[in-house]
Amino acid sequence: MRFFPVLLLIPVMSAAANYSIKRGVVDGVEVVQLADAAHRTEVTIVPSLGNLGYEMKVNGKNVFWTGKPLGELREKPSQCGNPFLAPWANRLDREAFYANGKKYLLNVDLGNVGRDGNRNPIHGLLTFSPLWKVVKEEADEGSARVTSRLEFWRYPDLMAQFPFAHTIEMTYRLAGGRLEVETALENHSMEPMPVAIGFHPYFRVHDAPRDKWKVHLAAREHLVLSRLLMPTGERKPVTFPDPVSLAGTQLDDVFSGLEPNAEFWVQGERERVSVIYGPKYTVAVVYAPTGRDFICFEPMSAVTNAFNLAHAGIYKDLQMVPPGGVWRESFWIASSGF
């Protein structure tokens, strides 16, 4: 990927320092790049495309699967890299959701609600949002980091769909060769705000074909899904082998009962990519379709269709942010053998 600096180039530290941060333009799109020289790691973030983590290169190899050049992605957005899903992740089972005992209808005429193959709402409202603003860029002896903010409450088309005034801050922090993604939700509303956000990162290893990849699932419970990929409320013990071979295996599964500091990973011959979940990411979706050279380990704060399942009494673990409160959690991406 070619990197062209623009007039605003931010060398936050001396040239001898390990961590650095700079802004630039790639394929006509403004980006922020974090670098960890000691671990030969560079991370590229695209604030104007949903604050997307687009690349995490280790020794020149991308840990993320990106699918297309950044200029093409801007013209025709599609899932890749590290997309953020909010205010709900994955699917809803209807064009409405419940919160605090009240039913809220989605206005599909506003054009900001995506749909899955069964015409159900999917992945929230912000996946490729241009509304993110960079508010802080720092690099020192400990890390390189950038924080972006989206003031959800300012935008009527968003509030019409999810009427909880809140602000989202997301920090990408590169330290010790690991990328931390920290998300904070501040609830400005007078009522508790339900939390069902998540991320849908796409990963790959380069030193083996997909059929040679091995996968570790750091969970105890496997959620039973309907034909529409909605949880039924039934949970079964995980019976996959450890590790799982992706040879002839397709995954589009939801897991709970995560191990402490749950670490999901995929490995080729030597290369390994791990995702470590903070404790408030209580659910993992794992997506690995056959015939595609990627796998997704998706940190989720709730199960699919959580708002409606909680209202029905099926899902008991929906997290809430009290009025004036803040929900905050991180997950980490690490690599080895690259």
Each model region followed by its residue ranges:
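Acidic/His-leaning functional-site neighborhoods
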Residues: 38, 59, 118-137, 214, ...
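Sec-dependent N-terminal signal peptides
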Residues: 3-13
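Extended, loop-rich substrate-binding clefts of extracytoplasmic carbohydrate-active enzymes
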Residues: 18-27, 102, 107-176
